Amino acid sequence: YVVGALARDIAMEILEMPPSPRRTADLDVAIALKDWNQFELLKEHLLENHFVKGKPKQRFYYKGADGNNDYEIDIVPFGELEADEKVAWPPEGNPEMSVKCFKDVMNIADTVVIDDAITVKMAPLSGQFLIKFDTWLDRHLLTDKDAADMLYIMDNFYLAYISFKQPVPDEVQETSESFDLL
């Protein structure tokens, strides 16, 4: 399922909210895997289908059949291969990252249809906030971008909720008048 800044941007566009001041140029995809052998098989499949490997272990670039594209994609494995809610890329266990809430967020992922052609699962804003909070706990001394992303989600999630909130039906409003207040 799609996570990261692009998931945030897609959700905010669907909700017709203002764009984030911090834009992204990559796609982060969380994939539940049984073990690191499955990650290697996935890597081989990507390399056979117009992707090239980037330097970071999770990074790939989609080149396309004509070789003219250069779209960055980070694959974030989680699931049975994690230990203590973290993944650590073999053989040296580096990089290591927390995937503490990825299973829970996957269970509440939204289904999004893009351009009437592509259907993807995507972390909902509440799940994106949880992932950002966990990431902030890991690296808040190194960067403030996760805090800025959380603030943006909180500010705009509330506005989106209010703008899409359904009015209370007249029957409910009328019924409440017939009760005595204590």
Question: What residue ranges belong to the model's regions?
Answer:
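Compositionally biased terminal segments of proteins
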Residues: 1-182
